[in-house]
Amino acid sequence: MDHNTDPPPTTMVDAAAALLLEPKLEGYDDDGGGEPLQPAPFVSPLDQLMQPPRPLEALLQGPQLPPFLSKTYDLVCEPELDGVISWGHAGNSFVVWDPSAFARDVLPHHFKHNNFSSFVRQLNTYGFRKVHADRWEFAHEDFLRHSKHLLKKIVRRRSSPTQQSGLQPGSSGESGLDPELNTLRREKSALLQEVTRLKQEHLQTIEQMSTLNQRLESAEDRQKQMVSFLAKLLQNPTFLRQLKMHRQQKEIDSTRVKRKFLKHVPHGNIDSGESSSQHTGESNLDFSPTSLDLPATHSDILDLQNFLLEDGDLNLAMLPENIGLDGIEAPDDIGALVQGFDTQEELELGSGVELLEIPPASGPRGQDPTIGRSKGKNVLSPGLDATSSEADCLGSFSDNMGMLSDSMLQTAGKLMDADDDERIWGVDASSALQSSCSGTSQQAYGSLVSDPYLMEMANKPEKFWELDFQALDDGDLQLDKCVIDDPALQQQRGNMNS
């Protein structure tokens, strides 16, 4: 007889009940030997209870999935929510297309909050990363389409004990960073203050540069005006001679006492003009009216050069490399004016010294009725009649004189005073100006040294360039009258001299 045993019970209670109710059976062999079969070994219920339990099917799947991952996976796979959240094109990421609708309609039904930022932070704790800068697209290497079983590999990140201790308030790590942060803050504040100071200095430097540029432009304008005026004087020597004659007839009382340097001249030379001429071997200057009718010659330009060269104060300022002017046109003789600068240092005179004047050149000495002896500035022959030609002659000159400052006029007067002093007191400048002056001019200048009338004029302080247009009335001031090219005036002077 075959003996079939039942399958093992599934539970301990069923196993214990089966053991108690199952009858004890004895079997015999099939061959009829009558020998009974060996009974089955007895297993007590306690032994069955001691057997290890068998796990259920759910336990075979490993650890359970976190609810957050399973819910998120279900939301991404749900077709109804494709307009709000769905898989990416490659299936290895998901995209939240409408964060506001996702937070308003989806999160409250599946999570305990409706904050989209909290949802993103929780994704970061599980290792998700944002893969697109312009949209909310997240990806994880184990979060794939049709691969839900890979979710068990996604583990929540846990902070290490060292990090937790470092994040605890009042920890030693935070206390060690505080001094460094304070030091950095102080350094930053100092750097900001330094930058502010440098900005202020930069602005001040810009203002100073602007002021210097304006001063340089003003100085260049004055130099251009001066050189233009001197060039025009070189081009009009006839007017220069008239200016010299007028200066010789004028007397201006000085309010201060000035020293006068007189060269000792023997009485014999003072009394006799002929002996002085023989001693110097030079002829006297001709200031007759006929000489005014002659055209401008090279010697006339040299006379002006002598006037301009005899003041040492302007020697350095008038050098070509110091002036730096390219637009001024002047005659070729102005080059000779520059050559004599270095040799004129011995002729420099103090600004507080008043020099003697050249006496009148035409008619009786100091008795010319046609030339007044008025005080003021720019008084040109106030006793003469005005003509249209005279007004034309002085038109351009008055315009140029208006452009010059008072200091420039005084400088021009010093130049002319220094020239007369050389010729009166016999200062030998012929060696310095030998390359630019002709022999006739040198002889003419030398003859003035022994002129007895010059010694007589020593006690008459004169200063040429103190001209005052506003000091005279309309009857005395005839600025627009010129005596250079008037034939009637020249004839009148010839009659007076004859």
Swiss-Prot record:
A biological process from GO: regulation of transcription by RNA polymerase II
Keywords: Coiled coil, Cytoplasm, DNA-binding, Nucleus, Phosphoprotein, Stress response, Transcription, Transcription regulation
Motif (Nuclear localization signal): 258-263
Stored Gene3D superfamilies: Winged helix-like DNA-binding domain superfamily/Winged helix DNA-binding domain
Annotated motif Nuclear export signal, positions: 309-316
Record's comment describing the protein's domains: The hydrophobic-rich region (HR-A/B) corresponds to the oligomerization domain.
Protein name: Heat stress transcription factor A-3
Lineage start: Eukaryota, Viridiplantae, Streptophyta, Embryophyta, Tracheophyta
Name of the encoding gene: HSFA3
